[in-house]
């Protein structure tokens, strides 16, 4: 039982937020799907029988069903953006302080771009200046063949931004394997403090973290903290456009049926672009482009949150539209 309110939620309450209840999330928010041990597994209202993503999958279901216009979520590796992509809604991971290798940002899921801007206190500009837009279709953190409809959506979005007057260029993976290896170790180290029984995946991370020595710990923090500079050095662009998911949301139970190691790696294959923005501390936004099966991901490298939302508005069309089930 909690003994105090999280500072982020306390600020929301002080500003008049109404919190009707708590939604389902996986154990410690450590998976990109929402199948908590011993509890019901929320279904994806836009693709019944398939995962709504995670870790904020329960919140995404509430928003996608229209039960609430927005819901609190957190993002330590894509946990706002992945559920948004799975359920046809809008998810924004704000820029955050990555001090001491912190990957987590607090934010919201929302049904429309207008609602997302409102809850994130962003004023969407009527127009944005000409920007340099990098297009990344190469997976960053895993090798995977990306589904054709995901790639086609990014291609059409890039064309739309070019027609809107932006300079659009292809970019390549910005770094090698070391940053994600560091992220994996950071998750493992953060799991060491988990007491008692845990799910197979969390137990595996905890055991793995307990074997990481002090020298390696210092090295992974240094590597993690260098990601922002690596990204900015690699790409001379203002905004990054990429897919969010490599393939459609899989059936409920798909990941959990695997060994913990395969589970972790396959989740990474499914979402190979998300974690980079957690390590870099940069803002990123996911929304449905054209239809719920083609979510796209735009990240702010050298622009403000308002400008990022402005770019999204160019692609989103009517910012008050809501995907109907």
Kindly give the residue locations of the regions a language model identified.
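Short, well-ordered beta-strand elements
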Residues: 292-310
